[in-house]
């Protein structure tokens, strides 16, 4: 073992945080927080879902991603409450999640959540491997942010085109290449113990991506211009070069990468900021903690503590105490847009640094700050509510999230309540006065995102204190009627009956499109046969039709003279993607021969209960590819 590697092992040996766990025992079930936060990433999955998928309201989606450029770019995570796969925040989220395992692997293991966590991270790293189609080519985004944000519906039935955008040596993107290199390098470390070949593969791609990022420099939004309104890299790319270099050093023990990181530090503005924190855009605050531990250099230690002091008790500058804004309720508040994600990020940095620093007063200071802020998010706040969906007291019920909401009409007001529980995400959070409204339309305060939960997940691991995870979690959601018919009587007399029927696809477990839906209308022709006529004499005609074919009457029970007409929408795509897209109407008439006064609908199975008002009826059963999916059939 080299001296340098021995030093590295001494610095980064996994340690039980017994002091933290025993000190911060509380009424909060931290492992439940951790369990649900991890599950959130499963809800964000794009692509072909495995049999192990635990959410019955999520299905395959984005299966043609990359088809426009001739590559398989399926997989990865949807960014937030939308369905774009933005490369920069996805890579950041994966890197931070891997870092939480690096720091708190033992906590994940003891909580019996390590496998779940690794599974979520692997979903992202698998995608990065697909997106890295050449040493100097990486597909940095799939989906048009503008088109995506203009539609409100479940991921499984997205109707818009999803173009792919790349970076290469002709049009580079240092931020996303270096950030992805960091995610893959960190991934190679945490997977080495359980899957060494996979870890080696991740490391190979990490090296290539970092070399690409370093050699061909440029801001990625100059090439992936579609990302600019959503994830512009305001901090530039130097911070990602530092961050990526550190993780490659940790993964390889190659001094070259540490030297590259330290060289990039010299390109960082000399007046190192201390009034912000880590984010998808700024990875300097993460990097300086790792550099403090690796190098023990005074500049990194002082900069880290200056930042953590600013967030906690205050930093003395020129005889004046500088401190972040605190809400009346005690939240360290940086910015309105996703206020809690910044606080969660700062808390994670405090946990990590407190676990390393030897000064007991500083250790206590940073731990106290981190745990208080975490508890604020879990319920210790003036609103007396949890800010984690599906957890605690009075949690958010209306997060800004398309698939969880489950609209069928391309409207965030329909339905009035979410159809699905999106367990685990941290919502944006309150304003500087602790005020918050649980409003689906408020994407500033009530959206969720993969980057919001990354460090927050680590906080759950940092404070885990021996509780047990929830058994049989998540519960399987009860499926509502997904396909059904509403019908009304337009006219009815002794010569004919005219019915208005609307076939609906409001599927959500999961949402899905169908081009093979049909329904049947059953009649009893006893009175027709009694008059010497047969089913062949009954006319079935469409008065108004949105694409269906009507069958002649077909025998169902000859002995009872029960027949049906099948209204078949085969070839017509019906899916929960808009007001006119999720339903199809037909008006049809059943008529006695030659206008004879022998028609009597009162004994018809499907006529029972119908009025002049539209209503759902189980007596008009619905079929998909010939299989009954709604309603009941007449007894034979």
From Swiss-Prot:
One GO biological process term is: cellulose catabolic process
Subcellular compartments: Secreted
SS bonds (residue pairs): none
Identify the residues that the record assigns to the CBM3 domain, covering every copy: 478-635
Q: Which reaction does it catalyse?
A: Endohydrolysis of (1->4)-beta-D-glucosidic linkages in cellulose, lichenin and cereal beta-D-glucans
Q: Which residues form the active site?
A: 82, 400, 438, 447
Say if the entry is tagged with keyword Secreted.
yes
What InterPro entries does its record include? 6-hairpin_glycosidase_sf (IPR008928), 6hp_glycosidase-like_sf (IPR012341), CBM2/CBM3_carb-bd_dom_sf (IPR008965), CBM3 (IPR001956), CBM3_sf (IPR036966), Glyco_hydro_9 (IPR001701), Glyco_hydro_9_Asp/Glu_AS (IPR033126), Glyco_hydro_9_His_AS (IPR018221)
Q: What class of enzyme is it?
A: hydrolase
Can you supply one Gene Ontology CC term for this chain's record? extracellular region
GO MF annotation, one: cellulase activity
According to the lineage, what is the superkingdom? Bacteria
The cross-references to Pfam families, in alphabetical order and at most eight, read: CBM_3, Glyco_hydro_9
Q: What range does the record give for the signal peptide?
A: 1-25
UniProt key word Cytoplasm? no
UniProt keyword annotations, A-Z: Carbohydrate metabolism, Cellulose degradation, Glycosidase, Hydrolase, Polysaccharide degradation, Secreted, Signal
Q: What is its EC number?
A: 3.2.1.4
**Family membership:** Belongs to the glycosyl hydrolase 9 (cellulase E) family.
**What protein name applies here?**
Endoglucanase 4
């Amino acid at each position: 073992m080299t001296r340098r590697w021995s030093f590295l092992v001494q610095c980064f040996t996994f340690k039980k945080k017994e002091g933290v766990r025993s000190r911060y025992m509380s009424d909060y079930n931290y492992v439940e927080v951790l369990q649900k936060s991890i599950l959130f990433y499963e809800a964000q999955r794009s692509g072909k879902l495995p049999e192990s998928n635990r959410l019955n309201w999520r299905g395959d989606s984005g299966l043609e991603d990359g088809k426009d450029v001739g590559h398989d770019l399926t997989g990865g995570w949807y960014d937030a409450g939308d369905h774009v796969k933005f490369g920069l925040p996805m890579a950041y989220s994966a890197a931070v999640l891997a870092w939480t395992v690096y720091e708190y692997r033992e906590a994940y293991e003891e909580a019996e959540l390590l496998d779940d966590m690794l599974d979520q991270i692997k979903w992202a790293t698998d995608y990065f491997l697909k997106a890295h189609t050449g040493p100097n080519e990486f597909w940095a985004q799939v989906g048009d942010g503008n088109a995506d944000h203009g539609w409100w519906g479940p991921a499984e039935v997205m109707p818009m085109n999803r173009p792919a955008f790349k970076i290469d040596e002709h049009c580079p993107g240092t931020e996303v290449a270096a950030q992805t290199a960091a995610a893959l390098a960190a991934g190679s470390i945490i997977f080495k113990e359980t899957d060494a070949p996979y870890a080696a593969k991740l490391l190979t791609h990490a090296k290539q991506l970092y070399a690409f990022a370093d050699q061909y420099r440029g801001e990625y939004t100059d090439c992936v211009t579609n990302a600019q309104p959503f994830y512009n890299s305001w901090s530039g790319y130097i911070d990602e070069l530092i961050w990526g270099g550190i993780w490659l050093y940790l993964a390889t023990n190659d001094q070259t990468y540490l030297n590259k990181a330290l060289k990039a530090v010299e390109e960082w503005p000399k007046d190192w900021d201390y009034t912000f924190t880590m984010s998808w855009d700024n990875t300097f605050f993460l990097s300086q903690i790792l550099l403090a531990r690796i190098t023990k250099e005074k500049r990194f230690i002082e900069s880290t503590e200056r930042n953590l002091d600013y967030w906690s008790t205050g930093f003395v500058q020129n005889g004046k105490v500088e401190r972040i804004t605190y809400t009346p309720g005690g939240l360290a508040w940086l910015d309105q847009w996703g206020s809690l994600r910044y606080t969660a990020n700062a808390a994670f940095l405090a946990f990590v640094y407190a676990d390393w620093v030897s000064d007991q007063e500083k250790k206590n200071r940073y731990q106290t700050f981190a745990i208080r802020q975490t508890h604020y998010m879990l319920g210790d706040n003036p609103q007396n509510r949890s800010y984690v969906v599906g957890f605690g007291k009075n949690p958010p019920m209306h997060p800004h999230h398309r698939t969880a909401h489950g609209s069928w009409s391309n409207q965030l007001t329909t339905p009035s309540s979410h159809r699905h529980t999106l367990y685990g995400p941290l919502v944006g959070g309150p304003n500087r006065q602790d005020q918050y409204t649980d409003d689906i339309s408020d994407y500033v305060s009530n959206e969720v995102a993969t980057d919001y939960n990354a460090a927050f997940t680590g906080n759950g691991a940092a404070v885990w204190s021996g509780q047990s995870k929830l058994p049989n979690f998540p519960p399987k959601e009860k499926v509502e009627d997904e396909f059904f018919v509403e019908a009304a009587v337009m006219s009815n007399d002794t010569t004919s009956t005219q019915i208005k029927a609307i076939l609906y696809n409001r599927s959500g477990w999961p949402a899905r499109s169908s081009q093979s839906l049909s329904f049947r209308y059953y009649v009893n022709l006893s009175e027709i046969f009694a008059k010497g006529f047969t089913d062949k004499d009954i006319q079935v005609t469409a008065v108004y039709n949105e694409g269906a074919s009507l069958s002649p009457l077909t025998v169902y029970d000859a002995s009872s003279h029960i027949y049906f007409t099948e209204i078949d929408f085969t070839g017509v795509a019906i899916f929960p993607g808009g007001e006119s897209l999720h339903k199809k109407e037909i008006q049809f008439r059943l008529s006695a021969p030659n206008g004879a006064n022998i028609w009597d609908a009162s004994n018809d199975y499907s006529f029972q209960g119908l009025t002049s008002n539209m209503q759902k009826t189980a007596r008009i059963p619905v079929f998909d590819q010939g299989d009954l999916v709604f309603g009941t059939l007449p007894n034979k």
